[in-house]
Amino acid sequence: YHYIDGGPKSDQAAIQKIIETSEVPCTSVVLREENYGVGRNLIGARRDLFDLHGYERVILIEDDLIPGPNFIKTTLSLADWAKSYNDVGMVQVWNLPHREITEIDLDVVEPTHEHFYSYCIDVRVWNEIKETIYAYESQYLQGVSYANKDWRAIRKKFMKPRYTENRIMRESPLLLPSDFEHPAPFGKRLKRTVPTGQDAITALALWEKGFVRIATLAPRAVMKGVDGVHSTAEV
């Protein structure tokens, strides 16, 4: 599915023609009625795939990554394995190792708050976190450009209350011990510079519902350049 923003300066017809005449796989082209921006497009795409089209699993890969030959296979295998645990909400096979990786690390996973360059999520998890994400979308992304969203209100009125509420604890079977303290995505206190985009809200929604995101210690993809194309990997 290809999503093309609309708006006064858009050229949807030309972009659609490029897509349809290229060799890029294309199921359908969705023409937005206005300029959605990255946040609403990513939320809307997950809404379409899960809520509208009934997909059971979605893998997201940003253009900052170059997937390795076993990227998809390993992602799907890890997701299948993780379904046995009620506390795993997302899996990913990309990571930023903080030490040298050896062959014995190939099967090691760890909980992470690393950047959302890539992840895999199942519909059962999406159904639990989407209410938070949709509330964020309707309150702060409608009728305003993504760059001009009210980040102060998002942090103070939307994110902070979720930090002070008791985090849901999942029932067994659990991957992590019941006494494991999985920190909130942005530390114990929300700083003024905390991210407020849809990735941040997705991470917060996972955390408040008691989920963790796990990543293979050994990355199955490499970043373009040193720090990717358009964002910083470390939050």
Give the positions of each predicted feature.
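Acidic donor-binding segment of Leloir-type glycosyltransferases
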Residues: 1-30
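Active-site nucleotide-sugar/metal-binding loop of Leloir-type enzymes
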Residues: 43-57
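C-terminal catalytic/acceptor-binding lobe
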Residues: 142-235
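A short, glycine-/small-residue-rich helix N-cap motif at loop->alpha-helix starts
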Residues: 33-41
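Short beta-strand segments
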Residues: 1-3, 92-94, 215-217
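Short beta-strand-to-loop acidic/aromatic patch adjacent to the donor-nucleotide binding site
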Residues: 54-66
